[in-house]
Amino acid sequence: MLLAFDVGNTNIVCGIYRGKELLNHWRLATDTLQTADGYASVLGTLFRINGLQFSDIEDVIISTVVPPIIPILESLSRRYFSVNPI
């Protein structure tokens, strides 16, 4: 599965895809002061509610207009999904 982050100034839209099919999506607040662990905590809850596990994620892509969030989401991807994001 693919986890896509579309980061805007106000919100991060996260989508989970299996092939071309969008399985789930969520909207989180964009916060450059949030840590990778903080985002992982929120995503972990959303994953569990929807019957997903971090180990289901095989690829991560980050699209952003907020450059300071890139290292945070890169760290999240590496630490929790064991994936180097695109």
Predicted regions, residues:
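Residue-level preference for the first positions of well-ordered beta-strands
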Residues: 1-2, 59
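Short beta-strand-loop/turn "lid" adjacent to the catalytic site in phosphate-handling enzymes
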Residues: 50-86
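Short glycine-rich, Thr/Ser-proximal phosphate-binding strand/loop in the N-terminal lobe
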Residues: 2-45
